[in-house]
């Protein structure tokens, strides 16, 4: 279990210490579950009333909240960002052994950097290049001529097809598949003819991809994921999609082929986005959005009907179904009124 003096933690976080710097911090916890040795954080002033009951040894907070502190405190401008950084310092995620498992199968032509870890039953095919400090989890497959940059980690059972490029310091969670064939077929009088997918997937640096996500290889050009992109679990990213730097994609999103998404976008969970179009930089699509047309202006976009009691929803649905007829009737009334005038 990691531990650190509160004063040392404050220094690493560039935080202002209030209280005993010799307190030993052994973990991060929520305000409700924290006990002695824990540090917690408060983002919203509405939680001030809970400080009296909080058992944490220290709390991260803003200057405005400091008068309400009942324990040692670290004062910062952005408590949530500080929480992320201190969680990294006190991370308890198991670290892999820096070795090659006896059951791993590694082709003689593969190139491995220093301190590479390859787990049990992993397969590394010919021409693969693994950078320094790369971690390949148990049961992973890395196909021919793929490259994985320094410091990147694949959790167990990740599949990387051939000719894929993954940048430095990337994290890919279990059961994700990178580089499977895109959904490309031509129709010959009712019969589907497969189109070989000859492109690649190019993933930038500092990209994180959740579990059970699929990113298809390009048909001719490449599927490209920019630097700093974060993608949640169970997303489908089709062939030739391009996602700009630092865009965030929440769980269950489906992106059709040849879609281009700009930088600094946020795509809400379970959204569906049409292909062969562009979304500009700094667009937010709220959850379950259905994007059928290009978006050319930054902003927040939504679609669909929010949850309602069933009886209310049925009435709303009926109105929507009849809106065309109502529009025609309204225009007819307007014409009559105009004629009378």
From Swiss-Prot:
PROSITE patterns: HEXAPEP_TRANSFERASES. It is an enzyme of class 2 (transferase). GO terms for cellular component: membrane. The gene is lpxD. Keywords: Acyltransferase, Antibiotic resistance, Lipid A biosynthesis, Lipid biosynthesis, Lipid metabolism, Repeat, Transferase. The SS-C mutant is antibiotic supersensitive; its outer membrane permeability barrier against hydrophobic antibiotics is severely deficient. Gene3D superfamilies: 1.20.5.170, Hexapeptide repeat proteins, MurE/MurF, N-terminal domain. Homotrimer. Pfam families: Hexapep (PF00132), LpxD (PF04613). This is UDP-3-O-(3-hydroxymyristoyl)glucosamine N-acyltransferase.
